[in-house]
């Protein structure tokens, strides 16, 4: 039997975690032979709910679940963690400006970065889900300078999956047939779901759709605004689909992307595609042996260029508003 992997999940009493934890414990993320220890963190006010979640996890009798720690102490939750999934963040309330959300959540992620720096395993992988995810990833990473920058990523996989789904429905194709989708930029309404490189078999998706008006006026805004539409329909934000995206993101990170395909991750920009260094930006990446690498050499047409730049400009504005949270 393999040694258990310690997985920290913040916001563990919340909606996304309720859809996530049972799948992790069942082996959906790391496989059917990998035991896990769940280290669950939430605020003291959520303790009763978290206790209920723990009871349900116990009652499932998962063979792979080697232990559960439930706490409001981040030092305990992050201690010797192998994987940290940072879901917990305050939601945007009515009347709250985006800058207010950046400030409130930025302080949470600054503190968590500092604690990760102290007690997490040195090769721990950290996935930031709580919004605004890109900038929260940067805050966490900068406050954990002893951990490798390449071990931090922000989640754009939900956006990536939404884009795949829209194309699959448009072309009446299985999602699994669609390769090389990209969502550039920020996990926000400036993101750019880019299907100019996407393929089904050896055929470009744009040559199958043959409808630039659908792409510009339906596909792109539908993916950009999908989260808000789900909230309007459900009265609650995306939870099961976000949990599924977390599973997909981490499976690719650990086990690799399929040959001839890539995925989207929010990672530290390095100058690729004329996006200046220093922000967490959605790029197409190939994963192999636990590492990820930006796909290089893709042609960026003028239509795409303006959208890549708009996302970068928004990220620099976010960065300017939280510089005081960086060491």
Curated annotation (Swiss-Prot):
Which terms are listed as keywords in the entry? NAD, Oxidoreductase, Tricarboxylic acid cycle
Give the reaction(s) catalysed.
Answer: (S)-malate + NAD(+) = oxaloacetate + NADH + H(+)
- UniProt: NAD(+) binding residues: 11-17, 105, 112, 129-131
Into which EC class is this enzyme placed? Answer: oxidoreductase
The record's annotation in InterPro entries points to: L-lactate/malate_DH, Lactate/malate_DH_C, Lactate/malate_DH_N, Lactate_DH/Glyco_Ohase_4_C, Malate_DH_type2, NAD(P)-bd_dom_sf
Keyword Oxidoreductase on entry: yes
Q: Name one GO biological process term.
A: tricarboxylic acid cycle
UniProt function note: Catalyzes the reversible oxidation of malate to oxaloacetate.
Name-wise, this protein is: Malate dehydrogenase
Name of the encoding gene: mdh
């Amino acid at each position: 039997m393999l040694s258990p992997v310690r997985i920290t999940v913040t916001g563990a009493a919340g909606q996304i975690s309720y859809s996530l934890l049972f799948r992790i414990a069942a082996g959906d993320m790391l496989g059917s032979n990998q035991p896990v220890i769940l280290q669950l963190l939430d605020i003291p006010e959520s303790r009763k709910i978290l206790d209920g979640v723990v009871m349900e996890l116990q009652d499932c009798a998962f063979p792979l679940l080697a232990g559960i720690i439930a706490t409001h102490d981040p030092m305990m939750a992050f201690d010797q963690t192998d994987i940290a999934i940072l879901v917990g963040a305050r939601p945007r309330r009515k009347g709250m400006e985006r800058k207010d959300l950046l400030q409130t959540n930025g302080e949470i992620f600054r503190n968590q970065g500092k604690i990760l720096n102290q007690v997490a395993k040195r090769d721990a992988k950290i996935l930031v889900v709580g919004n605004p995810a890109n900038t929260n990833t940067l805050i966490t990473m900068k406050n954990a300078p002893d951990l490798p920058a390449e071990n931090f990523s922000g989640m754009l996989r939900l956006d990536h999956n939404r884009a795949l789904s829209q194309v699959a429905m448009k072309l009446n194709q299985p999602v699994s047939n669609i390769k090389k989708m990209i969502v550039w930029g920020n996990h926000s309404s400036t993101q750019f779901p880019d299907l100019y490189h996407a393929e089904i078999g050896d055929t470009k998706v744009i040559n199958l759709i043959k409808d630039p008006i659908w792409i510009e006026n339906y596909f792109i805004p539908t993916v950009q605004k999908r989260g808000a539409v789900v909230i309007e329909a459900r009265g609650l934000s995306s939870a099961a689909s976000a949990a599924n995206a977390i599973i997909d993101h981490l499976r690719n990170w650990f086990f690799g992307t399929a040959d001839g395909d890539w995925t989207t991750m929010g990672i530290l920009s390095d100058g690729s595609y004329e996006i200046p260094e220093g922000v967490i930006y959605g790029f197409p990446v190939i994963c192999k042996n636990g590492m990820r690498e930006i796909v290089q050499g893709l042609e960026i047409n003028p239509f795409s260029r303006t959208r890549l730049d708009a996302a970068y400009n928004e990220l620099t504005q976010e960065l300017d508003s939280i510089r005081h949270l960086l060491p």
